[in-house]
Amino acid sequence: MAWEILIHPEVALWLQGLSDKEYEKVVATMQALAEVGPALGRPHVDRIKHSRLHNLKELRPLGSSLRILFAFDFQRRATLLAAGDKSSDWSNWYLINIPIAEKRFIELNDKNKK
């Protein structure tokens, strides 16, 4: 059974700005995530350390420094929460984007509970 992939509007905007080659890499990795779900591991997915969310992970399109932070919910969905290219700011990228992803995930879950 395939997993549903939801895309936060800010991530959707980011995707639109990618080159064709980058976009193809991201889509291929998203397709693998949809097919395999939480069992998809390295090199495509890695767990994020230092997050308040135990299930926060990063999608790692092969051969690139692009990263997409995402989390699974209890309804078999992965939500892409924050994205970017960490090549220009390798360590600070996570310091900036982990809190953004956490906040978006909590907001979406609160919204879905209503």
What is the role of each PLM region?
Residues 1-65, 74-78, 85-114:
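Basic, Lys/Arg-enriched alpha-helical interface segments
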